[in-house]
């Protein structure tokens, strides 16, 4: 997942739009209690899906309790299935994900599946970041996924052999839906007025995935919505319109987002000069980073009650190789430990997921891994292994 261009745009636009921010500053008094059951994990699809025989042993060595994996609807269902709620429908290809969950079980790691990416047949042959035309298609896919990874589904390997697939109980609805890289467009003009289309569509995406997962009849699954980008400009006329996370949460509620089991967020700092404890510099912040995550907790509580908060993506890049966005290797390890401590002190935070095991090779990508692209180990590897959980 490349965020270099995203962060440059968001930092620039947030400086312009700061005065028009929609966030309400507040720190929940509960944040000082310890989160004793917080799951700690890693998100690195190239390692877990691309080279899983290497990726999963590394996860085990890092003592990861959970791995986030993108379950791409478009790749599983390149063609419309005849019986969409049946995980054995021949239109579906789950092979990559079956392999991942089997290796996760072998290494005693839980899986968090994030459903995203609309198939061409479901949105008029447009980009994967365009919402489905009929949200029932997405709901049916979520049901099929939950059934396949219910813990009781047997994959038929041959006429005489079957494989019992492990259970997946944790699910995520989309990725950064307030960011046009993942859900577009964010705004649309309707009858002369701007509609926050991203939030409108996401309310339906979340409802569909929640209903599909819980409708499978497993009974112990949990579905998180949100997975929001920490920034947003709230400027529909801008070249790269996006919606700030608190505004997106409120708008999703207004447009009919009914329920979820947890709210997920990605509280990245905007610049390497800002530590995990730093708060947004603007008096009325549009962003939600780790230092002011209490603002998000308070708003979720106001709108939906005391739902858990999941940090499903976080990290600091290093220099080398990243001279602009990176911190030193030593500082990355220190910030990792600090960010974990901040999250763990907040009893509402139930999950903390670091982004990347290994750096992406292209500099336009992301370099927050515990290893460089060439395999050199950073001090953050040891820091992550030493996290107390």
Where are these regions (language model features)?
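Aromatic-lined substrate-binding rim segments of carbohydrate-active enzymes
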Residues: 56-61, 70-146, 192-226, 285-286
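Bacterial N-terminal signal peptides
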Residues: 9-18
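Noncatalytic carbohydrate-binding groove/subsite architecture in carbohydrate-active enzymes
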Residues: 52-53, 139, 143-169, 190, ...
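Surface-exposed, active-site-proximal loop segments in enzymatic domains
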Residues: 75-94, 118-140, 157, 164, ...
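Acidic (Asp/Glu)-rich catalytic clusters
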Residues: 32-35, 56-63, 99-110, 162-163, ...
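Structural recognition of the beta-strand scaffold that forms the well-ordered cores
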Residues: 39-44, 65-75, 110-115, 169-173, ...
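Boundary/entry segment of secreted carbohydrate-active catalytic domains
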Residues: 29-66, 70-72
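Aromatic-rich peripheral "rim/lid" segments of glycoside hydrolase catalytic domains that contact
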Residues: 167-172, 177, 182, 318-389
């Amino acid at each position: 997942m490349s965020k270099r261009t995203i962060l440059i745009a968001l930092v620039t636009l947030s400086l312009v739009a700061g005065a028009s921010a929609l966030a309400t500053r507040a720190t929940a008094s509960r944040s000082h209690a310890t989160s004793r059951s917080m799951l700690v994990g890693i998100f690195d699809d190239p390692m877990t899906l691309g080279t899983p025989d290497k990726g999963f042993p590394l996860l085990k060595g890092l003592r990861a309790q959970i791995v986030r994996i993108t379950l791409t609807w478009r790749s599983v269902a390149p063609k419309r299935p005849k019986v969409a709620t049946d995980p054995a429908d021949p239109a579906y290809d789950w092979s990559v994900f079956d392999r991942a969950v089997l290796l996760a079980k072998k290494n005693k790691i839980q899986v968090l599946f994030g459903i995203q990416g609309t198939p061409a047949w479901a949105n008029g042959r447009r980009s994967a970041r365009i919402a489905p035309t009929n949200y029932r298609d997405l709901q049916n896919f979520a049901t099929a996924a939950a059934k396949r990874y219910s813990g009781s589904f047997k994959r038929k390997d041959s006429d005489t052999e079957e494989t019992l697939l492990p259970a997946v109980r944790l699910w995520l609805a989309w990725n950064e839906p307030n960011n046009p890289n993942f859900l577009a467009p964010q705004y649309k003009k309707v009858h002369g007025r701007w509609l926050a289309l991203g939030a409108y569509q996401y309310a339906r995406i979340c409802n569909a995935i929640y209903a599909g997962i819980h409708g499978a009849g497993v009974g112990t699954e949990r579905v998180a919505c949100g997975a929001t980008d920490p920034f947003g400009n709230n400027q529909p006329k801008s070249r790269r319109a996006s919606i700030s996370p608190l505004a997106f949460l409120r708008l999703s509620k207004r447009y009919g987002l009914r329920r979820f089991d947890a709210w997920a967020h990605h509280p990245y700092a905007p610049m390497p000069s800002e530590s995990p404890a730093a708060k947004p510099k603007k008096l009325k912040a549009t962003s939600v980073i780790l230092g002011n995550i209490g603002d998000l907790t308070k708003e979720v509580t106001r709108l939906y009650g005391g739902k858990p908060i999941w940090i499903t993506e976080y990290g600091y890049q290093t220099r080398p190789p990243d001279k602009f966005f990176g911190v030193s290797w030593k500082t990355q390890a220190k910030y990792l430990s600090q960010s974990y401590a901040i999250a763990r002190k907040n009893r509402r935070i139930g999950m903390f997921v670091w982004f990347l095991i290994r750096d992406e090779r292209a500099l336009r990508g992301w370099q927050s891994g515990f290893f460089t692209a060439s395999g050199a180990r950073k001090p953050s590897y040891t820091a992550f292994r030493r996290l107390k959980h």
